[in-house]
Every structure is written in structure tokens, then in C-alpha cells.
Amino acid sequence: MALWGGRFSQESSALFKLFNDSLPVDYRLVEQDIVGSIAWAGAITQVGILSEAECQQLQQALKELLGEVEEKPELILASGAEDIHSFVELSLIAKVGDLGKKLHTGRSRNDQVATDLKLWCKKEGQQQLLLLKALRQALLELAERELDAVMPGYTHLQRAQPVAFGHWCLAYVEMFERDISRLEDALKRADTCPLGTGALAGTAYPMDRYKLAESLGFASPTLNSLDTVSDRDHVVEICSDASISMMHLSRMAEDLIFFNSGEAGFIDLDDEVTSGSSLMPQKKNPDALELIRGKTGRVYGSLIGILTTMKALPLAYNKDMQEDKEGLFDVMDSWAICLEMAALVLSGLKVNRENTLSAAQQGYANSTELADYLVAKGMPFREAHHVVGEVVVKAIAQKKPLEDFELKDLQSFSEIITSDVYDCLTIESCLEKREALGGTALPQVRAALATKLAASE
């Protein structure tokens, strides 16, 4: 039975019902719909629609219903109801009879679903924050284990300058901390209660919406009914935050996939996060990381979907908004499993220090140090840059690192070079010089790690 049948002289076609019904998606809002209905029963009691006894009877029946669907969630989809609101209301009527028909007084499914969705976003958002913080902790623990392992840093995927592996870990800590901050901000903006704004013009009953908001755990009520029932900014914003976070996850996955490759051999991944080949018995594939990278596009698609759905909707509510949930639910599911999987990958990751050090010593990563050495001797940097470029050309031709050149050969490029030049060409020197705030010198990395660990306690 539909909640709106009185206006119509014939029933909906089976095809329209299949097309229109949203229960297969919005059943996930059952807890929020029941909690909102319990609060609404209290609100309409305060304005005289229900007696205290009726309110208690309705609220008790709703609590019983919540227990039943938690124990047997299959009851929801088996009901054949149009949507989760219809399921809850019809189930309530089945329990308490005509009294259940009073519950929807002054309420529309428009403010009802807006409330359900915000309650769901608030709850699930808190779970995502916990997962983000767990991933941050996994990175911090990895940084502690492998802080002083030396590896090549890259620009353009070409070896550039040596960095500490702990510095690499802390780079991603910075990214995920921004994700935490963004999501916390989004949840603050979502912390306003839509209930009591009706279909679009507000409710005709003089209820205390501040008290209603407080009863549902919101910071305050919304202030404009037209905006309230048509607002899905919180969905867009959470999908956007998830997309940015998935970008960070995908970048980290890409780094680790490369580090794990036979060509690099920088890290080993645990067997529990890898798989093999059905044909090639030697293969150990980084499937967990590849799936994180793959699921990122899926999350982006949901963000574009909700933006496109909302971009041309007039005030106030439109049925298009029914399409807001499937993408949101998929975003949150995908984001959550990727955060969990990334943390698991990091927990078992081991750095092959000999390989990372060997790679850092190749590719003339100490060229910048030689240029800085010349600057310290009084040569303008642009000239020093040119001189070192010529040295590198000769080094490549002779297939030897800069530190293997004899002094007289280096002096043929500049007479200001003396025997102390070799002190600046070591890997250790390359790291030690980067001691300004944010640099990769080991004391800086240790200090940054200590600060992050203290903040995470």
C-alpha cells in the first residue's frame, strides 16, 4: 500500500513501481528513519497531536521494530514497500493499528529523508574519521620502523635527490591529516536538523525545532525550509572529501606498486595482501594496491553523478534527489575498505634497505650538492648549475658517479673546486644538508615524527 494513494483512481503499473521504488537502496537508512520517527512522536506530543500515552505506545513500538530489523534485516526488502519511510510507517500501523497513522502529522517525506540522510552521514562520517586516523597511525608506525632507510626521491619519475623513507611516510601523513580536517569540517556543516520543515514551506504546528534538533543529536535546526528539503550539499561535500582522500590513497598505492616492482625492489609486501597468477607460478601481485587505485575512479564517478543530478534542480524537492543515496553509499563503502586495506598493507611492509640505498646512489642524485658546493665557494647558482650539468654529461659518457672523478678532472670544470668537494658528494651529506623545517635531514624527520606521534596520542 502506498502512502499517497487517495489522489489516484488506478494503481501504478508494475514497471513504474519497479522504476520508482527506492527501498532496495534506502533500506540502509532504517535505523535513522526509526530514530527520527521516535523524536517526531515526541515533538507532535508537545503540540497536542498525541497524548503522552499514545506517544509512549508509538515510541515503544518503534523501538521494537528497530530490534526486529536489526535481528532480521531481510524483513525490510521482503516487505515490498515503496521506500524505507513507507516500510517503517506501515510496519508501525501493523503493530498499533490506527494510532500509527497519526505519526506522520505535520511531517513530509521530504524533511524526513533529509533528516535520515544527515543522521546517516554523521554516523558514517565518524567511522571514516576513525579509519583515517588508523591509517595515519599505520604510516607513523612504518616511519618509526624504517625512518633512516635512504631511498631515491623522484620528480617526473626520474631519480632526483635522496630522501629518508620516514620522510616519504610523513608526506602521506600530511595528506591524510588534511583529509581528516576536511571531513571534520564537512560534518560540522551537516550538523543541522531538517526535521520540522515539512514538504517545502515549513510545518503548520508550533513545535520547538531547537528542542527537536537537540533530541536527535544535532547542533541546531536548519533555518530555511525551501533550502532544507532541497539541500544535498552534505552529500556532495562528503563525496568530494572522499574523492580527494581516494586520490591520496591512489597516489600512495602507485608509489608502493612501483617500489614493489622487480625493477625497483625497494619493498616487500606481505603474502596476505597479494595474490598470484593462474598461469605463472612465480608471480606475487600487489592486488590490494591495484584495487585501491582502481576504486578511485569509481568514487570520482559518484561525485560527478551527484553534482550532475543537482546542477539544474529548481527549488525545492525533486524526485531526482532519490538518486543521491546509491552513489553516496558506494562512496562510503569503497572509501572505508580502501582505508582499511591500505593500513593492512603498511603494517606488513618491509623496506629492502640495500636496494633503496643503491638506487639513491645512482642517477647523479648528488648533482645539486655539487652545485651548492660551488655556490658556497662564491659562484652564482645559475653558473654553478651549468657547470655541474657539464660534469654530469661527462660522467654519463664515462659511466661513473660524480664522487669517482679525480680531483684534477673536476677542477677542469672549475678551478675553485678543492679536495673538500668529496665531503659533499656522499649520500649522508646530501641528507644532512636538508635540515631546514620540512626537510629530509634525519634530525628533522625524527622531530617531525615525534610531533606527529605526540599529536596522535
Curated annotation (Swiss-Prot):
Key word Amino-acid biosynthesis present: yes
Keywords: Amino-acid biosynthesis, Arginine biosynthesis, Cytoplasm, Lyase
Pfam families: ASL_C2, Lyase_1
Molecular function terms from GO: argininosuccinate lyase activity
SUPFAM superfamilies documented for this protein: L-aspartase-like
Catalysed reaction, written as an equation: 2-(N(omega)-L-arginino)succinate = fumarate + L-arginine
GO CC terms: cytosol
Pathway: Amino-acid biosynthesis; L-arginine biosynthesis; L-arginine from L-ornithine and carbamoyl phosphate: step 3/3
Primary subcellular site in the record, as a coarse category: cytoplasm
Enzyme Commission designation: 4.3.2.1
Protein's UniProt keywords contain Cell cycle: no
Subcellular localization(s) per the UniProt record: Cytoplasm
GO annotation, biological process: arginine biosynthetic process via ornithine; L-arginine biosynthetic process
Enzyme class, broadest EC rank: lyase
Family label: Belongs to the lyase 1 family. Argininosuccinate lyase subfamily.
This protein's name: Argininosuccinate lyase
Organism: Shewanella sediminis (strain HAW-EB3)
